[in-house]
Amino acid sequence: MQVVDWPAWLERHIPYYEKQKQQDRYYDNPPASVLVVDPMDRNRRVGHRGFAWSTWEAMDADIRALHYRAEPVFLDNDTHQRWYWVFWDANEALMAVMRLS
Protein backbone atom coordinates (compact mmCIF):
# COMPACT_ATOMS: atom_id res chain seq x y z
CA MET A 1 0.00 0.00 0.00
CA GLN A 2 1.18 3.46 -0.73
CA VAL A 3 -0.16 6.98 -0.49
CA VAL A 4 0.45 9.23 -3.48
CA ASP A 5 -0.49 12.90 -3.66
CA TRP A 6 -3.28 13.67 -6.12
CA PRO A 7 -1.25 15.56 -8.78
CA ALA A 8 1.49 12.90 -8.83
CA TRP A 9 -1.10 10.14 -9.17
CA LEU A 10 -2.66 11.89 -12.15
CA GLU A 11 0.73 12.37 -13.81
CA ARG A 12 2.52 9.11 -13.13
CA HIS A 13 0.27 6.40 -11.74
CA ILE A 14 -2.62 6.10 -14.16
CA PRO A 15 -2.87 5.76 -17.94
CA TYR A 16 -2.89 9.06 -19.82
CA TYR A 17 -6.40 8.46 -21.18
CA GLU A 18 -7.78 8.28 -17.61
CA LYS A 19 -6.21 11.56 -16.47
CA GLN A 20 -8.79 13.95 -17.96
CA LYS A 21 -11.71 11.84 -16.79
CA GLN A 22 -10.46 11.86 -13.19
CA GLN A 23 -9.63 15.58 -13.29
CA ASP A 24 -13.15 16.30 -14.52
CA ARG A 25 -14.70 14.04 -11.90
CA TYR A 26 -13.07 15.94 -9.03
CA TYR A 27 -12.84 19.35 -10.68
CA ASP A 28 -14.73 21.25 -7.96
CA ASN A 29 -13.21 19.43 -5.00
CA PRO A 30 -9.92 17.66 -5.78
CA PRO A 31 -8.72 15.15 -3.19
CA ALA A 32 -5.41 15.51 -1.37
CA SER A 33 -4.08 12.01 -1.93
CA VAL A 34 -4.74 8.53 -3.23
CA LEU A 35 -4.30 5.20 -1.48
CA VAL A 36 -2.93 2.70 -4.00
CA VAL A 37 -3.32 -0.98 -3.19
CA ASP A 38 -1.42 -3.48 -5.33
CA PRO A 39 -2.35 -7.17 -5.64
CA MET A 40 0.67 -8.08 -3.49
CA ASP A 41 -0.56 -5.78 -0.71
CA ARG A 42 -4.03 -7.23 -0.55
CA ASN A 43 -2.93 -10.86 -0.78
CA ARG A 44 -0.37 -10.59 2.01
CA ARG A 45 -1.40 -11.81 5.43
CA VAL A 46 -1.33 -8.77 7.67
CA GLY A 47 -0.10 -8.92 11.27
CA HIS A 48 -2.94 -8.62 13.74
CA ARG A 49 -5.58 -9.12 11.04
CA GLY A 50 -4.23 -12.53 10.09
CA PHE A 51 -6.02 -12.63 6.73
CA ALA A 52 -5.79 -11.16 3.27
CA TRP A 53 -8.36 -9.06 1.44
CA SER A 54 -9.76 -11.55 -1.02
CA THR A 55 -12.34 -9.17 -2.47
CA TRP A 56 -12.61 -5.47 -3.17
CA GLU A 57 -15.73 -5.34 -1.00
CA ALA A 58 -13.83 -6.64 2.03
CA MET A 59 -11.15 -3.99 1.73
CA ASP A 60 -13.69 -1.25 1.05
CA ALA A 61 -15.57 -2.26 4.21
CA ASP A 62 -12.35 -2.02 6.24
CA ILE A 63 -11.60 1.44 4.83
CA ARG A 64 -15.17 2.63 5.49
CA ALA A 65 -14.91 1.32 9.06
CA LEU A 66 -12.13 3.85 9.66
CA HIS A 67 -14.72 6.65 9.18
CA TYR A 68 -12.42 8.80 7.07
CA ARG A 69 -13.65 10.85 4.14
CA ALA A 70 -12.62 8.54 1.31
CA GLU A 71 -14.18 7.05 -1.77
CA PRO A 72 -13.08 4.43 -4.28
CA VAL A 73 -11.89 5.32 -7.76
CA PHE A 74 -12.57 2.96 -10.63
CA LEU A 75 -10.57 3.20 -13.81
CA ASP A 76 -11.94 1.97 -17.12
CA ASN A 77 -8.97 -0.24 -17.84
CA ASP A 78 -6.42 -1.00 -15.15
CA THR A 79 -4.26 -3.85 -16.36
CA HIS A 80 -2.29 -3.91 -13.11
CA GLN A 81 -5.43 -4.66 -11.07
CA ARG A 82 -4.68 -1.99 -8.52
CA TRP A 83 -7.36 -0.63 -6.22
CA TYR A 84 -7.60 3.09 -5.46
CA TRP A 85 -9.28 5.24 -2.83
CA VAL A 86 -9.09 9.04 -2.79
CA PHE A 87 -8.77 10.92 0.49
CA TRP A 88 -9.44 14.61 1.03
CA ASP A 89 -7.13 14.72 4.05
CA ALA A 90 -3.59 13.49 3.38
CA ASN A 91 -3.08 12.66 7.07
CA GLU A 92 -6.13 10.40 7.04
CA ALA A 93 -4.70 8.53 4.06
CA LEU A 94 -1.47 7.93 5.96
CA MET A 95 -3.38 6.87 9.06
CA ALA A 96 -5.42 4.45 6.94
CA VAL A 97 -2.23 2.75 5.77
CA MET A 98 -1.01 2.45 9.35
CA ARG A 99 -4.32 1.14 10.67
CA LEU A 100 -4.81 -1.34 7.83
CA SER A 101 -1.26 -2.71 8.03
Name these PLM-found stretches.
Residues 1-80:
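The feature represents the first ordered module of a protein
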Residues 71-101:
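Short, compact, well-ordered microdomains
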